[in-house]
Structure formats: C-alpha cells, structure tokens
Amino acid sequence: MVNNVTDISFKNEVLESDLPVIVDFWAEWCGPCKMLIPIIDEISKELQDKVKVLKMNIDENPKTPSEYGVRSIPTIMLFKNGEQKDTKIGLQQKKSLLDWINKSI
C-alpha cells in the first residue's frame, strides 16, 4: 500500500528524502486516478528499494499541487535530491511508468 503525503509532511517526506520520490497527485472524484491506484501500488512494491512512492489528495492538500503547477490529475511527479525532475500527466500504463522511472533515477 502506498503512503499518503500532506502539505505539512511534503518537505520531510519528499524534498528531504534520501531516495528518489514518486508523488501521485489525485482526487477521490477522479476516475482515471482510481484506475491508476493498482498500477501505483504494484510499482511501489516492485521498486521499494529504489524509490519512495507517495500519494497526495489535492482536495485535502491544495497548497503543494498549486506550488508545483498541478493543473490536471492524475499527475505523477518524480523528485530527486529535493528537486522536481520530471512529470507525467494522465493515466499511464505500468510499463510506460516503469520505463520512465528507471530512466529518471
């Protein structure tokens, strides 16, 4: 299961992480976001020693998505060494995400 990150915990969990971090920005009402849940869960398990995978509900945590320019969801961002390195927008296939993550880390 993927852990949640909040506006309050974002700095500690993401920006100060020793591992690269994938953040899935989502909302409860978003159909494609719900379709992405099992894919994100699988990726989290498969890459648990290489990356940290977190989810952020944009309705409960509006500050961070606004700061990073999240305009549509699902949006998946990769952070490394405290910086945003890359972004994917929309529903993604597992293979596409794995290739993107492995290339980026």
From Swiss-Prot:
Residues 1-105 form the Thioredoxin domain. InterPro entries: Thioredoxin, Thioredoxin-like_sf, Thioredoxin_CS, Thioredoxin_domain. CDD domains: TRX_family. Keywords: Disulfide bond, Electron transport, Redox-active center, Transport. It comes from the Bacteria. GO terms for molecular function: protein-disulfide reductase activity. Belongs to the thioredoxin family. PANTHER family: GEO12009P1. Component of the thioredoxin-thioredoxin reductase system. Participates in various redox reactions through the reversible oxidation of its active center dithiol to a disulfide and catalyzes dithiol-disulfide exchange reactions. This is Thioredoxin.
